[in-house]
Amino acid sequence: HPSERMRALVPIAGVIKRATKPEQVQAIIDRYAACPGWNGGHYYGNEIDGGVFDRMVADRIERLTNYGIGTHLADTVSDPAERERIIRGRAETWAREFDANSLYILYRAGIGSDMTPLAGNIKAPLLNVLADTDSVVDVALGQPTVDLLKSKGVDAEFHEIKTRYGHAGPMIDADLWADKLRAFLDRIP
């Protein structure tokens, strides 16, 4: 079983139970259905002219900006036009490589997704890391999740990092929890 072969688990910005609703899935579908070339999701070969590519780029720019990347760039790149160019470049790269149908399919998979009943199957020690400014995964879920895992016999720890960078904070500010990660990994054979 894969969980018996893992040395450690370090989820960042994750949850054990998703609260996705069918309306969220439909909102994504509706957003893309407004593109003239969507064709019920059969947009392939018509991404640019059909508006799907531009919609994906716009959605990704919004996501990157709201996930803390925009704040990080504002702190590290003085020129607003350059910040916009960087975000747009990342969004365009993503839009070329990602399938728009996957956006709602991933959300749909989250409906009723609850790993709580399987939590006791986790054999590897787990360090759950969340950012105090995350607008996607509420940091208040961190300790209760770890408490639940511990009640199922999982060797689990929670670590909250203080960062300005929201959902992307654990990656951007990895140095803030590097010592915690090192200590966690050092105690595991």
Please give the residue ranges for each predicted region.
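Short, conserved loop/helix-junction motifs that constitute active-site signature segments
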Residues: 119-123, 149-152
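Active-site nucleophile elbow and catalytic-triad environment of alpha/beta-hydrolase enzymes
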Residues: 102-118
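Alpha/beta-hydrolase-fold enzymes
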Residues: 2-93
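Catalytic active-site module of serine/aspartate enzymes centered on a nucleophile-bearing elbow/loop
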Residues: 150-189
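Flexible, glycine/threonine-enriched loop-and-boundary segments that flank and lead into catalytic domains
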Residues: 111, 141-142, 184
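An acidic- and aromatic-residue-enriched active-site/binding cleft used to recognize and process polar
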Residues: 1, 11-16, 131-133, 161-164
